[in-house]
């Protein structure tokens, strides 16, 4: 069975040897004084290094005291929910969107209201209507403005400005999940919403090193105002006390000596080639052209393919009969179906992508609905 990812990196190209060497050095260096209980916010060395990293590369303006390390971005979302949301609070989220985030918010017994997404990103007019209707119960909005999940669209400049005005007027937190920031293929990436200095106290910036290095290394971070960080730290102490200090110190070394940045450049070039190969495959096969529509993304690790003439559930069934696993569009909506699916290209070689397209082509032929024998 071949599983088409929804947008994960290729773990086969992870910088394993540099990381292993850095971990050995970190373990030796920490043996005498650094292997006891530490700060729940994470290793101070990595927090300082990350602050410099995002300030330089992403236009933020933060210090180590405004950084909290987490176990991946999912850990960051859960930590935010438990620290900042009360039972009965409401948080707005993109729709279609990232369902694991919705579940994290509901873990804190908060209510999630869904805001539609179109070609310019979050429908800020709909968000504003929710804010007025809820009269103070709406506390935050969760967005993926750089590469919206799952549709891959980038939030337009006009929508970004409107979002800032809404959050300022209604005193909402912007929970910005900036996943896949490093993977931009067309020009310079947009700066995060959190780079806006006049809104920094209301911005909660979430990012992850897991997709940059390897998904199995659960290492994410939150950047927020110090008052928010204090609440995050208190809850983190109750959840799992602290992270993996040896891993955190090793990653700090890899960022400081430029290994992470070099790996990102190599990966970005490779993933761009894979994206282009997949787009060529989709464009050159008539059955795929007829059934699939796509707006080529300027970054990220997946395509959002809209279906014509077949439901995503039916395509998933046909693909499964041919030993191919796809995730239906319904995984990204609150209820019902969605005639689309994410095709993650980064984790597959060009040969593997061609083979997957062979299977998809077979699934979309007129007689493909018949049971395979």
Pin down the residues of each PLM region.
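PLP-dependent enzyme catalytic core of the Aspartate aminotransferase-like
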Residues: 321, 335-373
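Conserved core segment of the aminotransferase class I/II
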Residues: 19, 199, 204-269
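Short hydrophobic/aromatic beta-strand micro-patches
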Residues: 223, 304-306, 344-346
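A short, glycine/Asx- and small/polar-enriched loop/turn
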Residues: 74-75, 189, 299, 335-340
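Helix N-cap motif at beta-to-alpha junctions
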Residues: 308-312, 349-350
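N-terminal "arm"/small-domain region of PLP-dependent enzymes with the aminotransferase-like
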Residues: 1-41, 52, 321-325
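Conserved core of the PLP fold type I
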Residues: 23, 28-170, 175, 182-200, ...
């Amino acid at each position: 069975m071949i599983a088409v990812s929804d947008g994960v990196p290729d773990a086969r190209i992870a910088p394993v040897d540099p990381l292993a060497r850095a971990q050995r050095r970190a373990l030796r260096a920490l043996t005498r004084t650094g292997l006891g209980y530490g700060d729940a916010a994470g290793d101070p060395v990595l927090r300082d290094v990350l602050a410099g990293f995002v300030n330089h590369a992403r236009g933020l303006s933060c210090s180590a005291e405004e950084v909290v390390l987490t176990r991946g971005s999912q850990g960051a979302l859960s930590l935010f929910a438990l620290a900042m949301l009360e039972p009965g609070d409401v948080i707005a989220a993109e729709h279609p969107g990232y369902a694991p985030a919705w579940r994290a918010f509901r873990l804190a017994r908060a209510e999630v209201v869904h805001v539609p997404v179109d070609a310019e990103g979050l429908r800020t007019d709909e968000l504003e209507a929710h804010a007025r209707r809820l009269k103070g119960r709406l506390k935050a909005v969760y967005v993926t403005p750089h590469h919206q999940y799952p549709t891959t669209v980038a939030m337009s400049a006009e929508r970004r400005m409107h979002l800032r005005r809404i959050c300022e007027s209604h005193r909402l937190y912007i929970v910005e999940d900036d996943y896949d920031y490093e993977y931009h293929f067309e020009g310079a990436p947009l700066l995060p919403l959190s780079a806006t200095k006049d809104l920094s106290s209301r911005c909660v910036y979430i990012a992850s090193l897991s997709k940059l290095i390897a998904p199995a290394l659960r290492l994410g971070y939150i950047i927020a105002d110090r008052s928010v960080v204090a609440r995050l730290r208190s809850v983190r102490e109750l959840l799992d006390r602290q992270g993996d200090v040896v891993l955190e110190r090793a990653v700090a070394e890899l960022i400081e000596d430029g290994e992470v940045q070099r790996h990102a450049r190599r990966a970005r070039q490779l993933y761009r080639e894979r994206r282009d190969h997949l787009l060529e495959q989709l464009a050159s096969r008539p059955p795929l052209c007829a059934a699939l529509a796509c707006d080529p993304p300027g970054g990220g690790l997946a395509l959002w393919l809209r279906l014509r003439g077949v439901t995503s559930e039916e395509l998933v069934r046909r693909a499964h009969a041919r030993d191919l696993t796809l995730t239906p569009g319904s995984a990204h909506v609150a209820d019902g179906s969605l005639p689309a699916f994410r095709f993650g290209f980064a984790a597959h070689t060009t040969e593997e992508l061609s083979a997957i397209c062979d299977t998809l082509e077979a699934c979309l032929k007129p007689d493909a609905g018949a049971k395979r024998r």
